């Protein structure tokens, strides 16, 4: 099993396998999730002081704040999947 990594801005990288959701930070429930994570010590601020544009929720209940748009993070995740799928297809062709 290969490890897939996603750049979430400013040189910060997370494991795609641990990702549960990428959401916008504007809604009240997400703001509540951020505050609860901060109180539990499970908040990771990767914004470098910039405005939070994406909130990333992981399977370990960590909440990661990013200054990159959610759509951008999702596109990076999808491009990683396409690269992996192309690699798998090439490996299958070589085996034949």
Swiss-Prot record:
<dbReference type="InterPro" id="IPR007169">
    <property type="entry name" value="RemA-like"/>
</dbReference>
<comment type="similarity">
    <text>Belongs to the RemA family.</text>
</comment>
<protein>
    <recommendedName>
        <fullName>Putative regulatory protein Teth514_1762</fullName>
    </recommendedName>
</protein>
<dbReference type="Pfam" id="PF04025">
    <property type="entry name" value="RemA-like"/>
</dbReference>
